[in-house]
Amino acid sequence: MAKEVDPCDHGEVVDAGCVRAVLAELVLTFVFVFTGVAATMAAGVPEVAGAAMPMAALAGVAIATALAAGVLVTAGFHVSGGHLNPAVTVALLARGHITAFRSALYVAAQLLASSLACILLRYLTGGMATPVHTLGSGIGPMQGLVMEIILTFSLLFVVYATILDPRSSVPGFGPLLTGLIVGANTIAGGNFSGASMNPARSFGPALATGVWTHHWIYWLGPLIGGPLAGLVYESLFLVKRTHEPLLDNSF
């Protein structure tokens, strides 16, 4: 991913590598959201808001999401880092591993990609209902918020442990392991908070449908959980005496 960088490096404005990275985030996030939303549509959106999705259908969505995340992070790792997710970008910004300028471009690209993917899906499916992240029946806003914080925390913790930490024994498998935690969290939290873990993944469907109910949860939760995971991992689990910088792959 990246060593510490100057958060205000304006030289990236004319950096061809930065442009390629932003375009990669646009393409990768588009495919990720397209796959995830399409899989959810194929599984069947419950007619009653907040109704639980059958476990078999939820497992299918989790598998599709996990495979997409693992493959796409691997594909984009050496170009943009394969963030696909504003929570990842903001977590790395908070710990000084990406510039503020590049992170802003990444988030803009991720949101644009998600919006385009969902709008295109509405056209390709003949106007089928686009699934929007919502709270499960009986789940209140604070419960949903805490759920999203925990799920995103676990996601970023795995990213740090398997990709960022130079001591990782399986760095090449880090993106695939990241996909596995995304799938596991989807099953664990899908029927409670929706298991977004990704503001961009929630933004596109909300924009395409105009349904913004509790949308703030899918921003605030991941943007708390992600940076918190970075703080905890770097403070407690990254061995300082080794003097090893975080893996530098222009993340």
Curated annotation (Swiss-Prot):
Where would you say this protein principally sits, based on its record?
membrane
**As annotated in Swiss-Prot or TrEMBL, what is the tissue specificity of this protein?**
Expressed in roots, leaves and anthers.
Q: Keywords on this record?
A: Membrane, Repeat, Transmembrane, Transmembrane helix, Transport, Vacuole
Q: Where are the transmembrane segments?
A: 26-46, 57-77, 104-124, 144-164, 170-190, 219-239
The answer to whether keyword DNA-binding applies is no
Q: Which Pfam families match?
A: MIP
Q: Where is this motif: NPA 1?
A: 85-87
- Annotated GO MF terms: water channel activity
Q: Where is this motif: NPA 2?
A: 198-200
Source species, domain of life: Eukaryota
- Cellular compartment(s): Vacuole membrane
Family note: Belongs to the MIP/aquaporin (TC 1.A.8) family. TIP (TC 1.A.8.10) subfamily.
Q: What is known of its domains?
A: Aquaporins contain two tandem repeats each containing three membrane-spanning domains and a pore-forming loop with the signature motif Asn-Pro-Ala (NPA).
What the entry lists under PANTHER family is as follows: AQUAPORIN TIP4-1-RELATED (PTHR45665:SF13), AQUAPORIN-8 (PTHR45665)
Full protein name:
Probable aquaporin TIP4-1
- Which organism was this protein described from? Oryza sativa subsp. japonica
Q: Which gene encodes it?
A: TIP4-1
